[in-house]
Every structure is written in C-alpha cells, then in structure tokens.
Design a protein with these regions (language model features):
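Active-site/ligand-binding-proximal alpha/beta "capping" segment
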Residues: 140-174
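Non-catalytic positions within long, well-ordered alpha-helices that form the structural scaffold/packing
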Residues: 70-73, 169, 188
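Generic hydrophobic/aromatic pocket-lining and core-packing "Φ" positions
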Residues: 66, 165, 181-184
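Zn-dependent metallopeptidase/amidohydrolase metal-coordination segment
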Residues: 178-205
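Metabolite-binding pocket within alpha/beta catalytic cores that recognizes anionic/polar moieties
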Residues: 1-123
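Generic non-transmembrane alpha-helical segments
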Residues: 129, 133-144
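Short acidic/polar active-site loop segments enriched in Thr and Asp
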Residues: 75-76, 174, 193
Length: 205
C-alpha cells in the first residue's frame, strides 16, 4: 500500500475517496493519518505538520511519523517537499524528483538506533525503483518532472541567508527545504522505500 506524506500546501487531497481518519499510536507520539483510495487503490496519508498545519519543521516528530505510516501498512512512501530553488533554471511550480540530500539540520532526533550500533547505507537514500515508478507515472500523465536533484535540508523555521545559499550552490545543491531530513533517513532505517518530490515555490534567498 502506498503511503503519502504531505507538507505545506497539501493539507487536503481532493481526489481521495472514502477518506477515514485514524490515529496510530507509536512509542514517540500518537499520529493522525487518513486512509482512503486514489483511483481505486488504497493509500494512507500523513500530514507532516499535523492537522491544521500547526507543527513547525524543527518540532516535527519525524520518528513518530515514519513509524506511524509504516505501522499503518504502507509498503512504500512518496513525500512532497515544498522547496526553494537553488538551481536558477528551476521556476515556481516545477517538480524535482530528488535523488540525493545534504543534511544541514541540527538537534533533530534522527534515528531509531539510539540503543544499538547500526550504520545505514545511504548510497541511494531515495529508492531507485520507486523513483522510476514516480517518473514513469509523471511521464504517462504528462506532468513535467526533473529526474534528479540534490536537496539541502535546513533546520528552519527561518529562511536561509544569501550567503548560505551561495555555499550550497558551490557543493552542487539543487533545491532547499526544511523537512526532508531526517525523514528520508528514518525510512531507510526501516527499509521502507521512499521517494520525495520537490515542489518549487520560490527562488531561494
């Protein structure tokens, strides 16, 4: 079953049929989700910022969210990531299928392995098979998408300075946001295939 993690600008999915709210209990927090159907296929939707978009990026319980969508039965996850464009060729409304990330956050609880030594392979943090499926679906439906891009995750809630954006440009970053990490890392730790679509909202800084 597909899991959808939505962020800013995606508080509702009008195409979701037979929507039923539910709460998933995890050791970290209780997480509200919505079950429903998209084009006849079952999905589970998790709003990253909580109901009413009330949780800022640095206060999101990423462990609770990823464990909740996993325990709700999702076997793969596609997330949205509203982002600023670092690559000047990207314009508002463009979509980027992210394939790498740079984690510039600090202080976030970003692992399930606090009590054991485990080193998760992050060579391909975004599942290549799932990315291929997303790319194919976009092509078949005529939705333009840039296949590949490096996402910088900053801590928020403030925006980045021009100097920070220039620094990220020098290391090859494509887009910047505040919520992609540690979400992707936690999904990898659970062997949960995860893909993220960067939705460009503005030029960074």
């Amino acid at each position: 079953m597909l899991g959808l993690i939505t962020g800013s600008g995606f508080d509702t999915i009008s195409e979701l049929d037979d929507a039923k709210p539910e709460v998933i209990t995890t050791p970290f927090a209780d997480v509200p989700i919505t079950r429903g159907f998209l084009d006849g296929s079952p999905v589970v939707v998790l709003r990253r910022h909580g109901l009413g978009h009330r949780i800022p990026p640095h206060r999101i319980d990423y462990r609770a969210n990823i464990l909740a969508i996993h325990d709700a039965g999702a076997t793969s996850v596609v997330a949205t990531a509203v982002s600023g464009a670092i690559d000047a060729t990207l314009k508002p409304g463009n979509l980027v299928l992210i394939d790498q990330f740079i984690d510039a956050t600090h202080g976030r609880l970003g692992t399930f392995f606090d009590d054991e030594v485990r080193h998760t392979d992050m060579t391909e943090p975004y599942d290549p098979v799932l990315r291929s499926i997303v790319c194919q679906a976009a092509n078949e439906t005529g939705v333009p998408i840039v296949n590949g891009g490096t996402y910088v995750c900053t801590n928020g809630p403030r925006f980045e300075t021009p100097a920070e954006i220039r620094m990220y440009q020098t290391v090859g970053a494509t887009l910047v946001g505040m919520t992609g990490c540690p979400e992707v890392t936690l999904a990898r730790e659970l062997d949960l295939p995860y893909a993220s679509i960067g939705v460009i909202s503005n030029a960074a800084a």
